[in-house]
Amino acid sequence: MPRRHEIHGVYIPGSPVSPWPTIMPDRTQKTKGIVLRTVKYGETSLIVSIFTELFGLQSYMVSGVRASTKKGTGKANLFQPTAILDLVVYHNELKHLNRIKEFKWHHLYKNIFSDVPRNAVALFMIELLTKCLKQPEPNPELFEFCEDAFIHLDESSEAIMANFPLFFALHLPAFFGFRISDDYSEETPVLDLQEGTFFADKPDYLHFLEGKQAEITSELLKIMQPEELAQIKLNQDFRRQLLHAYETYYRLHIQDFGTMKTLPVLRELLG
């Protein structure tokens, strides 16, 4: 029987068969990305977790950005969590750690990095998004939602900002398949957090909302534009209760969700 040789997936009869698998080359690609997490590596480099528009969740090595030389000064600041960047990356889907060739601001915030309460909200959103992202799969609709959310947060009034964590926490699950069904009514006033829907009666377990908490949750689910958040007037204690309930909702629907590290800070800062 004639032997055959594979070149780029095509078998050539009569040629020797190579024992080595085909190696995928690194390709340069342009994409936007939202920085999730940064870890120092070596003396001058960073390893950065980024949610990209084209490839989803990715990890990158960024060399030389922490160098004390003139060339490296200030570049590490671009990799703060929540930063929205334009990237040119070396992408190889077989690698767990790729490299960034070029980077620059896509959107430069006015307030998120300098305003303490606003930064606390942004970091809460980043942590929530990070806990939901499990696989390096592209999700352009989710990326657009997150990009718009961070830009709106940066430019919003204090009244909108105070309700922004609630808005983000309720609308993010739609992209992961566990959005709460907004079927609240006088006949179905109890939100079952385990089932993610409203019922007429309380369940036999403790994970549910009723009364004003269920009603406000329904109102927040109806909001499609962040500007509408200014119409919902809540006090600090009520927001804390809702944030705690929404954290419970995530724990019920995402395996190994754990505890939100940013939530205690957020509870103290938002009035």
Where do the model's predicted regions map?
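Intrinsically disordered, low-complexity proline-rich regions
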Residues: 3, 13-19
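Acidic/polar hotspots within intrinsically disordered regions
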Residues: 5-8
